[in-house]
Amino acid sequence: MNLPSALLALLLAAPVCGVDADDRVDLTSPIERNLPPERNAYIIWREVVPKFHSPEDENVAKALHDFTRFTESIPLDEVRQKLAAWLDSMEPNLDRLYEGLALGACEFPESNLSVYAFSFPAFRRAWEAQLLRARFQSEKGLYAQAVETLAKGLRFADLNSSAGGDIIHWYIGVASRNHLQRGVRWIAMQDSASGAIPALLAALSGLFDDAAVRRSVAAEWTNYVLPDLNDVISGLATNQLFQGADGARLLNRAACTNLLVEMGEAVIENTRLTWAKQEPFLPDTIRTLCPMQDVDKIRDITRDASLNEKWFWNADTVTKVINLGQARENGVGLILVAIYAPERESTPRLYFSGRTETSLTRAYLLLRAHQLRAKEWPAQLSDALPANPPPDVVLDYFSNQPLRYSRERRLLWSVGPDGT
């Protein structure tokens, strides 16, 4: 078989001094670890390519997989150009090729060859087949690496084309089963001008129309990347959800809004379980506060005042609870609940217990800023409350709507846009 001249140029671009005409590599044994990467890559490629015309050779995929790990030394642009040309010449044996590439992509996600290969539908099918094998199902970290690689591979597809849409929806369908958030996190932190953000979020909004999927993904996100949820939320918010016309359309999608709702509830549940280990009375308190769906339920809440004081004044600060239960299609009607002791503190204050909850608050701030078309907003939600609120009415800094509170129940809640 004759190799395309472009492929030969690719392979010979790196120095391969010392490679003799009679050199052979045993495809049934591991690669020579003491050889320079360029030499190993050259030897393997020279041995593998002719064997694509011998389907009975089951070592082809393994050898190509070994070659994949060495392609980081080859410029990505060259990989893109010359891999595509080579694929055209290998049509009869692509299944074997893709199998090897998929195996390599799972184990070496940073390989340039792995990253670009995701642009090819047949490769994506082979990659999914590899993931379904037992060895990959039992290695969740490896799965997450492969998903992240796919996210990077999306950079090299035209996401505005029908093929690009197929890539996005295929990615969502496969990756949402496990570790979706890792790929989304990577994409969320990229420049929104890349085109990946709008296309991915558009697909996500459709995916999240399914409430069960929403809950599952929200739980996965909050459990798997709890310390990094701030990056996920902030990245999605600043890159796409809250910018420009496309952002406005996505923002108005109930499914996108509901995702924040599900994530907020997952965080609250996680926090409740953490607090439950510390003080036995906290679960009942949180359980009473968190499922609030309307103001009437808030008004009906009655708790022992001493418990509330013990709960919040045991710590250095008071506590806040964010309820995300009132999603509206045109945004989020967010109820903020602050329980405080007036005799100890004249101003209701909000307590941030870690980066995760702060990130949800930041997402809310960005949401409100977008809705009200304001240019600047406070970095901390506590800054939004007046230093000396009136005794009976506090104004919501974001919407200039009055906040009602009950001195007896020590509750502060916001009034929605419709006055409820």
Q: What are these model-derived regions, one by one?
A:
Residues 5-15:
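Bacterial N-terminal signal peptides
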Residues 17-420:
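Short acidic linear motifs
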